Swiss-Prot record:
EC category name: ligase
Quaternary state and interactors: Heterotrimer of A, B and C subunits.
PANTHER family found in the cross-reference section: GLUTAMYL-TRNA GLN AMIDOTRANSFERASE SUBUNIT B MITOCHONDRIAL AND PROKARYOTIC PET112-RELATED, GLUTAMYL-TRNA(GLN) AMIDOTRANSFERASE SUBUNIT B, MITOCHONDRIAL
Entry EC number(s): 6.3.5.-
Keywords tagged on the record: ATP-binding, Ligase, Nucleotide-binding, Protein biosynthesis
GO biological process, one term: glutaminyl-tRNAGln biosynthesis via transamidation
Taxonomic placement: Bacteria, Pseudomonadati, Pseudomonadota, Gammaproteobacteria, Thiotrichales
Record's protein name: Aspartyl/glutamyl-tRNA(Asn/Gln) amidotransferase subunit B
């Protein structure tokens, strides 16, 4: 039996502020439990919220990047429910008047096909605390450090039809919030969490009952969880059962989803405007001022790299994979004026070293200026490409700049024609049999001679000059 899959995602992006959305408590990750929660976060009576104004432009930036309508009058609402990590008994969120309204679109590419995914809305809200189950056998601990952390919840249309499409959309949104500088995207620390709403139905029939997969924190797990949920729903329906509207948790260790609770509808939360917070009024001048601060978006940057730098689509996509990577690459190009050579070094030796050490490019011991300095020494024939890799290793190990390492280790390329000719003469004199073989038609011996000259010069002879002198001598 053929089933059609329908998927919508709700992404919770933690905004990069110093303090919480309605209180002055810090949002630094990793503090001891309950050390970053003040009286408001604890739900104590008589405490009033004060909006952290820094969250407003961050939300508007996302709306502009998506091409969505910005809510000119944005209202905060109380979302009422009881859970141990929500001591107030309600979450301050947005319902009827979100800061980012309809019209947003994200383009994804899956299996070579471009697809547009609609974004329903994005609204501001406070995060809840965290329930800790493992540390207390038979009990649950509550850490309220996270309570009140500013979130932007980004809600997609149910436009995705496979787990692959859902992952592509999540990755695109992950890239976007990092480029905008509004979220650090750290999934391990919970800065970027994804809820997946999954249903199935027969083509031509209404959408089926959806189940929500909660708080998945890696792209791999998103795909696995959705695939499992699709299989589960098919099995339920084909065995004559009914899919229940519920929230389910994905267990990565057991690779299964399990029921957490029945899924609520909006009216179950009894939303009403928060009486303690005034509506936020956003003017055209506010929007234009924020638009002027917007960075170049990744899709536009990729197109520019292909058009202006002559890079391939693959290289452009790799180099724009993160804003930090793109900024590093552009800093190297600005100094060397060699886009393709710079791209090769960033994608090659630099990325290999970053991966081996497991660090981000922002933590690279080789700065963009240092890499540019190395490329300049290749360009002016101070060193060969082969020696350059040795110099890069020295730079990575903290031995200094390219110029310092070249000087300290005596790595300057031999370009003196008489010195190269002497090296060639020695190699040919010591390999008379190979010379005869070459002259007898074994042209592959030419590579042998080049290798011997480079070996004799410890890799420092200019390869182009070596080739030319050998050709002249072997005529």
């Amino acid at each position: 039996m053929t089933w059609e899959v329908v998927i919508g995602l709700e992404i919770h992006a933690q905004l990069t502020t110093k303090t919480k959305i309605f209180s002055g408590s810090s949002i630094d990750y990793g503090a001891a439990p309950n050390t970053q929660a003040n009286l408001l976060d604890l739900g104590m009576p008589g405490q009033l919220p004060v909006l952290n104004k820094a969250v407003i432009p961050k939300a508007i930036k996302l709306g502009l990047a998506l091409g969505a309508k910005i809510g000119r009058r944005s209202v905060f609402d109380r979302k009422n429910y009881f859970y141990p990590d929500l001591p107030k008994g309600y979450q301050t969120s947005q319902f009827s008047f979100p800061i980012v309204d309809t019209g947003g679109v994200v383009e994804i590419e899956v299996d070579g096909e471009i697809k547009k995914i609609g974004v329903t809305r994005a609204h501001l809200e406070e995060d809840a605390g965290k329930s800790i189950h493992d540390a207390f056998p038979g009990q649950t601990g509550i850490d309220l450090n996270r309570a009140g952390t500013p979130l932007l919840e980004i809600v997609s249309e149910p436009d995705m039809r496979s787990a692959k499409e859902a992952v592509a959309y999540a990755k695109k949104m992950h890239e976007l919030v990092q480029y905008l500088g509004i979220c650090d995207g750290n999934m391990q620390e919970g800065s970027f969490r994804v809820d997946s709403n999954v249903s199935i139905h027969k083509p031509g029939t209404p959408f089926g009952t959806r189940a929500e997969l909660k708080n998945i924190n890696s792209f791999k797990f998103i795909e696995q969880a959705i695939e499992l949920e699709i299989e589960r729903q098919i099995e339920v329906l084909e065995s004559g059962g009914k899919v229940v509207q519920e929230t389910r948790l994905y267990d990565a260790d057991k690779n299964e989803t399990r029921s957490m609770r029945e899924k609520e509808e909006a009216n179950d939360y009894r939303y009403f405007p928060c009486p303690d917070l005034l509506p936020v009024v956003i003017t055209e001048e506010d929007i234009e001022a924020i638009r002027a601060e917007m960075p170049e978006m990744p899709d536009a940057k990729r197109k520019r790299y292909v058009a202006d730098f002559g890079l391939s689509d693959y290289d452009a996509a790799f180099l724009t994979g993160s804003r930090a990577m793109a900024e590093y690459f552009e800093a190297v190009v600005a100094k060397t004026n060699e886009a393709k050579v710079s791209a090769n070094w960033v994608m090659g030796e630099l990325s290999k070293s970053l991966n081996q050490k497991g660090i981000d490019i922002s933590e690279s011991p080789v700065s963009a200026d240092m890499l540019a300095g190395l490329i300049e020494r290749i360009q002016d024939n101070t060193i060969s490409g082969k020696i350059a890799k040795q110099v890069f290793d020295g730079m990575w190990s903290g031995e200094g700049s390219a110029d310092e390492i070249i000087e300290q280790k005596g790595l300057k390329q031999i370009t003196d024609s008489s010195a190269i000719e002497a090296l060639v003469n020695d190699v040919l004199a010591n390999n008379a049999a190979q010379v005869e073989a070459y002259k007898g038609g074994q042209e592959k011996m030419f590579g042998f001679f080049v290798g011997q000259v480079m070996k004799a010069s410890q890799g420092q002879a200019n390869p182009a000059q070596v080739n030319q002198v050998l050709k002249d001598k072997l005529k």
